Amino acid sequence: MTHPTELPLSPLSALQFYATAPYPCSYLDGRIARSQVATPSHLINSDIYTELVKAGFRRSGVFTYRPYCDGCRACVPVRVPVGEFAPTRTQRRMWKRHRALVATVSPLHYDEEHYALYMRYQSARHAGGGMDRDSRDQYEQFLLQSRINSRLVEFRDLDAPGGEPGKLRMVSMIDILGDGLSSVYTFFEPDDRHTSYGTYNILWQIEQAKSLGLPYVYLGYWIRESPKMAYKANFHPLEGLIDGRWKTLDPERVDLPPVDAALARAPLPGGHSGSG
């Protein structure tokens, strides 16, 4: 990593921002990516992380980053304003279909059943991508390490006769921010076809945010050119962080430069520009 950039704004002034070396993009084939990383990780508490998320950052374990690619700004941070959210007919149908699932919220913790489901999900959905070979340690580093207010949510069928726990269908990790919930990662039973568990999970998070009095659910990055990201555009209204400002996003008409256009550096929190 090179070129630390200090951010002269308390309490974020203690952080430094680095640009990583180039690496293959995991979203667009043939593209080269870079990330901007916020360090040191032990200083990033929930309040600071909230400000970073509002500036387009995400986390993987204790690694806090945002896209910082040369000549590309395809990744758009998106969030749902829960007070204005209007579900589609399909989303209402998915909500009714899965409402019998029992959601249990707990602190982050390791569970062998969760790990087994994670590996089945990766093998079915992302075979050959590397994550389908994650060890238990890698799984824990990716999903169970956090220095902020994070929760694990498991979704099961109703308890079986005799009190046995119902079948595990889905596991989701979320962060609780000062202004919303942030969806970290979700995996589910890959053998259940056409279930739209991912859609249901976001609907569940929207309802949770409402119940907690939080205005947003942050969905990470939406990439117009990536079919895997298409589902995020189905939640309306959707806000995107473009040129440093959150604005209502029309995925069909959003005015983004083409992937090969020159990168306009998004400002860091407080209006300061970063550098690689």
From Swiss-Prot:
Keywords, ordered alphabetically: Acyltransferase, Cytoplasm, Transferase
Catalytic activity field: N-terminal L-glutamyl-[protein] + L-leucyl-tRNA(Leu) = N-terminal L-leucyl-L-glutamyl-[protein] + tRNA(Leu) + H(+); N-terminal L-aspartyl-[protein] + L-leucyl-tRNA(Leu) = N-terminal L-leucyl-L-aspartyl-[protein] + tRNA(Leu) + H(+)
Domain of life: Bacteria
Molecular function as annotated in GO: arginyl-tRNA--protein transferase activity; leucyl-tRNA--protein transferase activity
tRNA processing found in the keyword field: no
A GO BP annotation: ubiquitin-dependent protein catabolic process via the N-end rule pathway
Any single Gene Ontology cellular-component annotation: cytoplasm
Enzyme class: transferase
Compartments, as annotated in UniProt: Cytoplasm
EC numbers for this chain: 2.3.2.29
Described function: Functions in the N-end rule pathway of protein degradation where it conjugates Leu from its aminoacyl-tRNA to the N-termini of proteins containing an N-terminal aspartate or glutamate.
Family according to the record: Belongs to the R-transferase family. Bpt subfamily.
Official protein name in the record: Aspartate/glutamate leucyltransferase
Organism the protein comes from: Burkholderia cenocepacia (strain ATCC BAA-245 / DSM 16553 / LMG 16656 / NCTC 13227 / J2315 / CF5610) (Burkholderia cepacia (strain J2315))
Gene name as annotated: bpt
